[in-house]
């Protein structure tokens, strides 16, 4: 196998996906995050597998990276990070309910719920999104391929339109880091670089 050729092909394919970047949805997502921050609403983010690690990373970047030195903090929770809770709900109820059951404890009207799913069809993510939408929340989805059910269900759908899970996840992490830097710059107008540590 020619690994150099493989790398070049992978990068070119990723560039093609990024050429179709959904800028308007990206802006909507940033504005929803800033609105939740300004109004003191909670933000819940979740995913499975690689999307779960992206969700966890996203929460860290918002909670620490964007507002460490600000008086008003983000209130962000990753629903896949509390492993004992996830396992308890999965064991005693169903894996499909692991996120929605946590929302029932913490969610309040006006909160923002973000689901990350490569396929857009993860049922546990969809159940949580449905609950949030039915109870006065704002919802966003970050998915891939053609968007899946998630894209049709949320208020703000961002889709990385490529039929390759790894490239979908690549784009999702790029979106997370772009959001972090954009939000940081908005909340730190005195910092000319706009780049968090």
Please annotate each region the language model reported.
Residues 19-39:
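A short, well-structured juxtamembrane/interface segment
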Residues 51-56, 121-128, 150:
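Short glycine/serine/threonine-rich phosphate/pyrophosphate-binding segments
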Residues 35-107:
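Glycine-rich, small/polar surface segments that engage phosphate groups of diverse ligands
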């Amino acid at each position: 196998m020619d690994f150099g050729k493989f790398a070049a092909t992978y990068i070119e394919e990723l560039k093609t996906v990024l050429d179709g970047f959904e800028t308007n949805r990206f802006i909507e997502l940033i504005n929803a995050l800033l609105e939740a921050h300004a109004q003191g609403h909670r933000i819940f983010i979740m995913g499975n597998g690689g999307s779960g690690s992206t969700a966890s990373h996203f929460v860290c970047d918002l909670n620490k990276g964007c507002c460490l030195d600000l008086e008003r903090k983000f209130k962000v929770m990753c629903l896949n990070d509390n492993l004992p809770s996830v396992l308890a709900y999965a064991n005693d109820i169903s894996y499909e309910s692991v996120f929605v059951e946590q929302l029932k404890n913490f969610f309040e009207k006006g909160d923002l719920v973000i689901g990350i799913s490569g396929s857009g069809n993860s049922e546990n993510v969809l159940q949580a999104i449905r609950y949030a939408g039915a109870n006065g929340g704002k919802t966003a989805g970050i998915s891939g391929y053609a968007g899946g059910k998630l894209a049709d269900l949320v208020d703000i759908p961002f889709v990385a339109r490529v039929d390759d899970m790894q490239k979908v996840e690549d784009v999702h992490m790029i979106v997370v880091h772009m959001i972090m830097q954009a939000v940081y710059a908005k909340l730190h107008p005195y910092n000319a670089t706009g780049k968090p540590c």
